[in-house]
Amino acid sequence: MSINRFKLQPLLPAIEQNALILVPNHRIRDAILCSHASQAGATVFRTPRVFAIDIWIRDMWELASNRALAPFCNLQLIDAVAEHFIWLGIIERSLSELPLLNPDQTARAVGQSYRSLKQWLSSGDGHRELAGATAIPDVAAFSNWVEQYQQYGEENQLINLVDCTQILLAALDRPAFNLVGEAVYLVNFYQPPPLYQQLFASLDAVAAVQVLQTSEAAPALVRHRFEFPDQATEILRCVEWARTLSRADSAAHIGIISNRDETQLKQLQRILKRELLANPVPIRANDGNPFNSSQADLKLIDAGIIHDAFALLNLGRGIQDSDDICRILRSPFTDGAEEEKEARIQMESFMRRNFGNRCQLSEFSRLLNSQSRDYYCPVLGAGFAGLARRARSLKGLASSAFWVGQIAALLADFGWQQTARGKLELEILDQWQEALELFANASVAVGKISFATALSRMQTLCAQQAQRLKFDPRCQVSVYSVTEAVGLSFDHLWLLGFDDRHWPEAASPSPYLPYDLQKQAAMPGSHSEVQFELARASFAVLCNSVSQSLCASHHCLDAEQQLSPSSFIADFPLADAALHRREHGATDGKPGIEATLSIEDLPGLALRSDEQIRGGSSLISNQSSCPFRAFAVHRLAAVAGAQFEAGLNSRARGTGIHVALENLFAGIQSRSDLVALSPAERRRRASAATAVAMETMGAKYPLVMTPKFAEIESERINTLLLRFMELESERKDFTVIA
């Protein structure tokens, strides 16, 4: 039996007549298509014409453009990535006048403010009021940026989705769109912005439009409210509830609505994955993810293979952080990683003993190709040699499409993409390729840029994109926010973390639009009153979308702050959390562990005949406190590598002193020789010994021993040598033996 995520019955007439069905987002579209496929009763059937509203707007624009209709054919519709890069470029050019800590974050906020202005004040009144509020510094800056953005769009014939919607709604009666008399269903559009309301009104003037909302109150709905002492307990009980329901009914759609607390969401997803995958009832899930969600807790750049890709790409800068080089040495995503594993470990160990926090690539490449050393890595060395040959092509300014080609070639030199093995890594690579295509297509938005800027833009793009969570119709559990869940149907629903601090959500008005203007237009986030009304409407729709049971919960204490239930759930009957736990058979231990396991202890590894173990009191101390630590440290030599330090570390400084002392006392064989030296002669010999030490350290640490740093270090060593000779001259008679 299939899982029902949408009440399809009211929509069946529209599907039978092959009407155009518009929905707010892809989640509802996927739910409709899955429900229809499960009820079709045949292996072959006609796919309903269901479109998310933004996709339909883009399709209409492309249709008119392909038919050479003005102004559609004269303007290129850009995606969200290109739009963001335009805003980012405008804001970066204004940094000399308006210093900002995070231009990328500012660009996102400014872009969102512009879209809100167009969506909620599309009549033009907002622009007049915006012009009259330029005495406010943030509003004045925003007005200037908007003017530059619009000018850039006119010069390059570009337009974004919100602007193209305003043009489209005035042209829907053209024959090219084939909309006259067509049946159009607007499904589950709750609280659309005024711009969409105007679009729907224009659509209603040329087509047979019907508005359909599928939420309706269930007469037998059971409601409960739970209070828990802390967030961790609340999450665990919610997960136990979902696990129990999935065992009892394999066709139930189980929803968990999380507030916008990122910490709560990450813990919830982690525990859900652990507990549902341990469920004795087989759960068919996508790549070990047993629930559907739109809120991935990891970004694309957080994937190890993508992180290492940027580490390789940043090698084009010449001088690198030593930690980044070590990351490349440890990476399993480069060619030869398995064959040269031991040699690369030795290379990192050598670096941590002898390198500072900065590393010159030419020196590192030379060491990699040292055949007589145990850190000889010819495969990785060949990649660095290819980088040196490619360095000339990484200079100058070029389009993003050109840099995408260089990025692919540079990564290919290291065999990066050839090392992906698992399905998850391959899907991450597919998303990476899509990101490269988006960046290449944004050439008109970013203009001519340097390779360093191109890498920065790509990192921005990958930091914004969440790792894709594909919708799996076989997963029973769905984790959404309130906004994401509105329009779907659930058999059971748990409202998690609905306390008086998180629901309704706090107001977060845009700093770039006048506050009175935002409140007057009822923009989401503009004012607490607006937030309350929006929350009340969304909450009512959500409650009417549940057919069997609705649970709501909150925890009473967050650090030292006391929390109360949200006013929206205060009238839910309060249930005993302990009783709820007993009813669902919860246990404190991890599910699935019901018996003690017997494990055979492996015998200790015998010492080889040539193996020597060193250790003093620390060996005895480690053995008594933790035998494993003693084995790891003294037998396996498994100790943490030395940390890289800025400048010279204490070990390098000590080496310099030892070299200087060795040279100094090569000509002093006894105390009598030392006492016989005049002050001038002592200074001369100290200077000569210091020069030898500085020459040695300069050859070993060329990046650190800059002229100024060498001058400071030379003065330090020279002073120590003079003081050392004074102390030695006060000792009793001695003779230098060695």
Predicted region positions:
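Polyanion-engaging groove/track-forming segments
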Residues: M1-F734
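Active-site metal-binding core of divalent-cation-utilizing nuclease and nuclease-like domains
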Residues: I737-A738
